[in-house]
Design a protein with these regions (language model features):
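Conserved short beta-strand edge segments in small beta-sheet-based binding/regulatory domains
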Residues: 80-98
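Short S/T/G/P-rich N-terminal loop/turn motif that feeds into the first structured element of a domain
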Residues: 1-56, 64-74, 94-115
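A short linear boundary/processing microfeature
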Residues: 75-79
Length: 115
């Protein structure tokens, strides 16, 4: 069961780079599918948010083992996709996250500081 996640989020495409952003999304979805088939990630879920006036309009949550996701984050393909995303998407970012049993571990660590 996955205990770790990568949150890959963005706002909207840069004006004039909409087609590049659409093409990038398709290639990245294919790449994430290959990562899942290769056992490097447990799963991934793309999410597009409804209009809300904020600066987050979509994200993909990659789920898996912390060590494997750390390796994925350092792969050349992941790095290249992230660089391209920074040129065609506003507010693009990748953030580490905890899910499943990972949440319990993090809260246990935090609770030490509140005792």
């Amino acid at each position: 069961m996955a205990d770790y996640a990568l949150f890959v989020g963005w706002n909207r495409s840069v004006a004039g780079r909409e087609q590049q952003a659409i093409d990038l999304f398709a290639r990245v979805m294919e790449y994430y599918g290959q990562l899942q088939n290769d056992g490097k990630i447990e799963s991934f879920e793309p999410v597009v948010l409804s209009n809300h006036g904020g600066d987050l309009n979509g994200f993909v949550l990659l789920r898996g083992d912390a060590a494997k996701l750390d390796e994925v984050r350092r792969e050349e393909a992941f790095t290249n996709f992230s660089i391209e995303a920074n040129f065609c998407l506003e507010n693009f970012g990748v953030i580490d996250g905890y899910i499943g049993d990972g949440i319990t571990r993090v809260f246990s660590q935090w609770s030490i500081h509140f005792s």
